[in-house]
């Protein structure tokens, strides 16, 4: 008799186009479950699911439910949704995304990556090293892994690598055999109520690791370092650039398109050894830090130093993580357009530092603030996050369903940037205005970085062509 049945009937995902939902749906489809779903709009994620044979309906209507035996909902789906209401009326089980992911994780040993920033990139780096080591893991990520062309993959081994989203506390359901915490910053306070509660939940996440597992913690981050004394009965391995790290980055050297660095590994007996010449095809010191987390995981899984040294060679990065999306011919050279998901001040600062590190001319930031509440709560931090940009263009706030807040808008951010000493910041109304402005000012070797979690990615995708059209007028 099979231990896990796949003939339970149709599993219906409400909000299947969300990056977290789509990964679970794809893996379950590949496991043999009958999967379908609905979403509010067409997207590249929806298109990808259909190509893989998963039916997706656009719009939320009760009739979409069909003969579903189980309903899975994303965090964005609330009571009152017609599909949820019909499922409850018919007594069809309704489970949250994290609960379904937790059920999948029961089938395998798991690496769970959590943290306020860097989860998606670190998850993809862990997958890359395990692939290089012949582990062939199942992967469910919060972003499209370029080498997969998807955010999910069903592997043949007993290991799974997952991104653990802390936004609503549901990551506490995800008990990793190996847990990673990249950083802890004050985010999602609308759910948690206070930063202390955020930190408490990360401690609980680490303590959920079994006695035979390990927690990889970034000692460079003060709030992560602060929770280490609270974890007294689990194996903790620290990583970072600190001299106290168990897995330490050393001799970091920027190279075209990325970094080369050494790793100093401290064993339990205090002895150390070096892994020299690790090449990472991603720019930015923060990405070396993410790579150190992945290396720590690989070491825990007994992947050899030789494989670790070369394991990132085929790493193609993650969609919308410092992704080059276009070039603009200018004079005898070109300007580059980059698309990045960064929407928190810490992320923006790291992305712009990486850009400055590799820039040969101006760094031009185009930011679309994401949510009025985030801009309100972190306004001071946003106003000091753009020092590495020569020029900042601030787009209207992407509301993400929120109502506007008086005095919290693009103009307020620009005013604050100028008050804190930024020499060039202005509001930009839309993609057409941006293209027209850049056409008159952009120069060879400039780097334009579009930042945000909203539809700024569409601005980035069409920007090089739009600038070219403006220039040709």
Swiss-Prot record:
Recorded source organism is Rhizorhabdus wittichii (strain DSM 6014 / CCUG 31198 / JCM 15750 / NBRC 105917 / EY 4224 / RW1)
One of its Pfam families is Mur_ligase_M
- So what does this thing catalyse? UDP-N-acetyl-alpha-D-muramate + L-alanine + ATP = UDP-N-acetyl-alpha-D-muramoyl-L-alanine + ADP + phosphate + H(+)
| Location(s), subcellular | Cytoplasm
Q: Which family does it belong to?
A: Belongs to the MurCDEF family.
**Keyword field contains Transmembrane helix:** no
Q: What EC number(s) does this enzyme carry?
A: 6.3.2.8
Instruction: Tell me the protein's name.
Output: UDP-N-acetylmuramate--L-alanine ligase
Q: Which domain of life is it from?
A: Bacteria
Please provide the Gene Ontology terms (biological process) for this protein.
cell division; cell wall organization; peptidoglycan biosynthetic process; regulation of cell shape
EC primary class: ligase
The principal location of this protein is cytoplasm
Q: Which Gene3D superfamilies match?
A: Mur ligase, C-terminal domain, Mur-like, catalytic domain, NAD(P)-binding Rossmann-like Domain
Name the encoding gene, please: murC
* Coiled coil feature spans: none
> What InterPro entries does the database record attribute to this sequence?
Mur-like_cat_sf, Mur_ligase_C, Mur_ligase_C_dom_sf, Mur_ligase_cen, Mur_ligase_N, MurCDEF_pg_biosynth, UDP-N-AcMur_Ala_ligase_MurC
